[in-house]
């Protein structure tokens, strides 16, 4: 599974990041996983819906399981994958065509994109579990990135 690493930007440059479109950020700490959707808004500069809040997710089952959350967020890819699988089963497309079209689906704007951020206490097992769940949910764009200072503060409040 390819992971996308963002380019390192020098601290003194004043480049605004692109708008987050259909993005979920997972933050791993100890054996816990937290997430937020969309852009990060600190308490000092809240967005339209207020500052960003972290929600805890789990790798088990239930309403807040990573698998269930990803399935609901990535329904565009999952529904279209089912259509492609039907065509593959009926021999209307080749398996190489299926793989290419599925790969194209995961890169469309409607497909969910995931940022993975970890602190110093995050367990390797949690990272691997999350990447496994992302693969199961057919998430095509996964980018491990560093925690921002605002995200670190928010994480301290949760731990």
Roles of regions detected by a PLM:
Residues 1-68, 76-101, 105-106, 143-159:
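Extracytoplasmic juxtamembrane/flexible linker immediately downstream
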């Amino acid at each position: 599974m390819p992971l996308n690493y963002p380019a390192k930007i020098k601290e003194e440059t004043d480049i605004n990041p692109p708008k987050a479109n259909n993005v979920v950020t997972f933050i791993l700490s100890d054996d816990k996983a937290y997430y937020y959707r969309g852009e990060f808004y600190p308490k000092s500069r809240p967005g339209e819906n207020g500052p960003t809040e972290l929600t805890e997710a789990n790798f088990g089952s239930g309403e807040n399981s990573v698998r269930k959350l990803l399935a609901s967020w990535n329904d565009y890819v999952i529904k279209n994958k089912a259509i492609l699988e039907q065509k593959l089963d009926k021999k209307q497309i080749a398996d190489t065509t299926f793989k290419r079209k599925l790969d194209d689906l995961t890169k469309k704007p409607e497909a969910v994109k995931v940022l993975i951020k970890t602190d110093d206490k995050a367990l390797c097992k949690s990272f691997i579990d999350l990447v496994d769940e992302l693969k199961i949910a057919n998430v095509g764009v996964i980018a491990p990135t560093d925690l921002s200072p605002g995200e670190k503060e928010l994480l301290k409040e949760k731990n």
